[in-house]
Amino acid sequence: NWEQIKELDKAPFVQIGHHSHSHNYLVDFKNEDFINDINTASTIFNKRLGYNPIFFSYPFGEYSSLIKKYISDNFKFSFGQHSGVIDITKDRYELPRFPINEKYGDLKRFKFLINLYPLQYKVLHPDEKYVTISNNPPKFIVEFFEKQKNINNINCFSDEGDKWKKSNIDFNQKILTLNFREKFKFR
């Protein structure tokens, strides 16, 4: 409740984040509807806390280039739902995060996660991360910086065809290309 949020907000190590008003798939909204949804939540934050959070987390980790642009105009940072370690090479409007919850939150896993190294990359394609009929399957290419720890041991997994499996990858020195075998199923 808001009293608990206000209590947390007083702690010096806590940042309250924005996650939309409806917690629906923003990519399914018309442009004006997703903007209204964000603005509704922002109005509530301003009324209850006296400010709008600087952090945004995309509901279900989904966003389009248009949504990302709106968020980048109104927030300082945003998080997807892809796992990874934040470092200086990451786009501050596509930050990775690890789920820590009742299913994925035991102490052993937490200790493992805080000791991970980031995969630092120069280029990540495609720019439009939202998969539609016209770009399914996407062509996914990552160009890494050189001299990274264990980079040759990289593996990728995807749920193409609605079943999780190890992805086909080509890894040539520092460029990784994912060659998806099947189209992704839509929800």
Located regions from the model:
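Active-site-adjacent pocket scaffolds in enzyme catalytic domains
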Residues: 1-17, 68-129
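Metal-dependent polysaccharide deacetylase catalytic core of the NodB/CE4 family, i.e.
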Residues: 1-66, 89-96
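Weak global preference for isoleucine
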Residues: 5, 16, 35-38, 44, ...
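Generic serine detector
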Residues: 20-22, 42, 57, 64-65, ...
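Terminal accessory/targeting
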Residues: 23, 97-187
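Glycine-centered structural positions embedded in regular secondary structure
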Residues: 48, 78, 142-146
